[in-house]
Amino acid sequence: MNAVDLAADDSALPEGRFSGRTEFGNLIRQAFQAAANQGWREIIICDADFEDWPLGERAVTSALGDWSRTGRKLTMIARNYDAVTRRHPRFVTWRQTWSHIVECRGSASGPSDTLPSAMWTPNWVFERLDLERSAGYSGHEAARRVALKEGLNERLLKSIPAFPATTLGL
C-alpha cells in the first residue's frame, strides 16, 4: 500500500468492525496518513508493547514525518517498549528526532492483557478487542471517542515516563 492508496481525509477512514492482522495494519497506516493529511493535533496510541503494529514501516514513519508540525502531540502508552526498539528502528529514529512532540508513558499496573490496544484522535478511534485475531472496531462516533479517551486518561494518570529518546551515560 502506498500513500496514494491511503485515505485523504478522516471521513474515509473505516468504521465498524475489523478483523485480522492485515486489516489491523492497514487501519494503522490509513490513520497516520489521515493524521498527516488532516493535521490532527493530538494522537494517543496504547498497546502492551506495539510489537505487531507497523510503526517501523516507511509509509508510517513518512506519514508521521508529514504530521510532525507545530502544536502536534503523540502520546504512547505501553507496558514495555523493548519490542519497539527491536522491531521498529525506523520509528525509534523518528521518535528521537521528534522527541519534543512524543510523550512515552509506561503502565505498570495489572497484567498486560488489561492494557487496551487502541488509537484515539479527536476525530476517530479504533480499539482492538481480540488481540489473537486482531479484531475490534473503529469509528467516528462521539460516544466511542469519549469513552476511549476517558479510559486512556485513567491509564495516563497512573503511568510513569518511559522509553527516553536518548540515554545519557556517565
List the predicted regions and their residue ranges:
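PLD/PLD-like phosphodiesterase catalytic module centered on the HKD motif
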Residues: M1-I44, A48-L170
